[in-house]
Amino acid sequence: MFDTMCVAARSMPFWCVANPLSDPFGGAVQPAPDALDVARMLAKAAKNGLIEMTSAHDDDLVPWDPAHPEDDLDPKSDVYKKLRAIKKVLAQGGLKINMVTCSLHGSTLFRAGGLTNPDAKLRALAARKVERCLRIGHLLGAKHYTYWVARDGFEVYEKTDFAHIYDWLAEGLNHVTGYIEKMKFTNYKGATLEPKPNEPRGAMLIPTSGHAVGFIMTRLNKPAFWGVNPELLQHEGMTLL
């Protein structure tokens, strides 16, 4: 089902406001603001009638420590406290979270892929990180979860395990809906698959919207729950479509 809010609502994501103005060709030109300061800026924008919604990667909000995959559940942890402080600020501004997405590209652990990493232990770690992201989204009342292909791709065709790699991806995405059901998260109205033809990998496993639709309809357990985030002016534009 098409969600008109994705085009009707004005939104500004955490990662745009927090960007230190770096790019692949040069480093940051200003310090990255703290996530709580970003939340305050976004809440102020909402109060001034400039935006209605925001979105975030899990790593935009709090740091991730693979040694403590459930720190968001520990009332004594800084992550637990930070998330609730962010939630309070956003609520005071009347700002809603439209979408959360799990960063499976920022850590060097996932250089060879997140959900499709050839190392089963790293795939399992990626799944734990996705679970944490879904819990964060539940806390903040996110409407959607988005999977971006990120590092799930390849550079060398001959070294890629095509006999299994799409099975691993399906397993990872089916785990999303399975975990939402297991935890009885009712805030999520759906999830989306966000394709990209290349970057940061040489080639992606889900390069276009057509590939995304085909994968959803043929490989996922609950296709009706999934949609496509086409990034028409960004990722899809890279394919010259």
Where is each model-derived feature located?
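Active-site beta-loop-alpha junctions enriched in small/polar residues
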Residues: 15-17, 58-61, 102-105, 150-152, ...
